[in-house]
Amino acid sequence: MPACARVLDFPGSTLAPAFFDVHIHGAMGHDLMEATPGALQAVASFLATRGVGNFLATTVTAPMDVTLRSLEGLAKLLDRPPVEGQAHAIGIHLEGPFLSHVKRGVHPPASLLEPDIATFDRFFEAAGGYVRLMTLAPELPGAAELAAHATARGVRISMGHSNATAAETRTAMAAGAVSATHTFNAMRPLDHREPGILGVVLTSDELFAELICDGIHTAPEMVKLWWRAKGPERALLVTDAMSATGMPDGEYQLGGFPVQVAEGRAMAGGVLAGSVLTLDRALANFLRFTAAPLDQALRLVTANPAAMTGLQEQVGALAVGRTASLVAVDAAGKLTASVIGGN
């Protein structure tokens, strides 16, 4: 050990890779679709304080010109090298516009589109190839063809904002879909005769599944059900956090529309509009709701999102030669220390 080295000890804590959030729209008063250096820096700096080392900048459905402009701006920002002490935007999650009108949530209906390979290619090129993940409703005409095309271009497909039947869901899986977006939310409910997308998500061993574990989007009992179904290899926690995260209650923006935030709930038109959750709190909530072993729970914010996105050679593990991005957490999942980007 070099003479100048400092030894840091955190008794009772567990060392783990820094967290990876594959579904986040913003924080600290900024929406990532602003695609400005100031917005990205504010979000990335805040995430680092919550133990996040890497994230996918997530879009929301918007008019075509707005989406293209945001993707072009994000691509330029993602071309820059990572900054010490800030979470690294390692790619883009395209959430919309290929979503169901029936399960759109707060995504503006006028900007929703049916799956179209040419439109996707415009998005992909505008984003400089940084689209790593795309949410897609399997039941839409052309969804399977788009899933296969996007998969061939290296984009992982997550099924969500969907009213799909079980058969439609399995068709999307055969075309390349690997995950489910914020399981239970904006998703056809379970039925004992037509299990739908949710039934397939919960019973397919090969599918990953996101969950927003804030106690608002999903009740603790349903978190337990999800955990028992997906287990430590296929479950992953996300925040779906929007610009109000880390800020006081008030009115904020998600994409281009206003969201009212009060007492931990982000609402637009009476519908949940993202969250103000942080990934460290999601981990602590998950442990409290399920009593899962800490080593298994940590996979949900590290190794599993890395595997789902195909980025496991870059993030999600402690390995010699990788940039030092790591966290220490106590037995309850509370963050006790973090080193992000070597700082």
State the predicted function of each range.
Residues 12, 23, 47, 94, ...:
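Conserved, mostly hydrophobic/aromatic
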Residues 25, 41-70, 86-101, 127-139, ...:
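Divalent metal-dependent hydrolysis catalytic cores, especially in the metallo-beta-lactamase
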Residues 100-128:
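Conserved phosphate-binding/catalytic loop of the ribokinase/pfkB sugar-kinase fold
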Residues 121, 125-247:
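Active-site core of metal-dependent hydrolases
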Residues 232-255, 260-279, 321:
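Short acidic/histidine-rich active-site segments
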Residues 249, 307, 317-343:
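C-terminal cap of metal-dependent C-N hydrolases
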